[in-house]
Amino acid sequence: NLLGSFSYCGDGSVIRFRKISRMKLTANITLDELTKSQIAERKGINNNPGPQQIENLKALAVNILQPIRSHYNKPLIISSGFRCAQLCTEIGSSINSQHVADNGAAAADFEIPGVDNRELALYVKRELEFDQLILEFYRDNEPTSGWIHCSYSTEANRNQSLRAFREDGKVNYKPWLE
């Protein structure tokens, strides 16, 4: 049981002990990888997920992250996984982001060093069931540019594929049809 190793405070916050932060969600993905945030640490923000959020993060790890890790046999660099609402506000993200891991879904931003991010996104698109896949800020002439955003829903996956790009100083999204 994932939830048995946590202590829950009366206010609903979670106390995570050092050994728990290394809790394995899959053979190669830990809870710590999905919750670590330099901004949260710097600002003193408690970025610990609650019980349902942990279950959603585990579903993301089992159905998206571990299959990628196993296919490429290389570690993923997760730049952003779980974000509590306070952290989302701090970085200018929506508190409705799937990174908050509520409503049966969770998301992560990641890449694999040495693997073309377009190739990585195509693998996810062709081989895995996902809710949303975004190839973010990838430049065709720079294979390691940008990163992948991918979410997984335990309820209903849309298999929505997008590409994010900057135009006139704004972030835009368009369907990714490859």
Task: Enumerate the language-model features and the residues they cover.
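Extracytoplasmic cell-surface/polysaccharide-interacting catalytic and binding patches
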Residues: 17-71, 165-178
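Catalytic cores and adjacent binding grooves of peptidoglycan-active enzymes
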Residues: 98, 102-106, 112-178
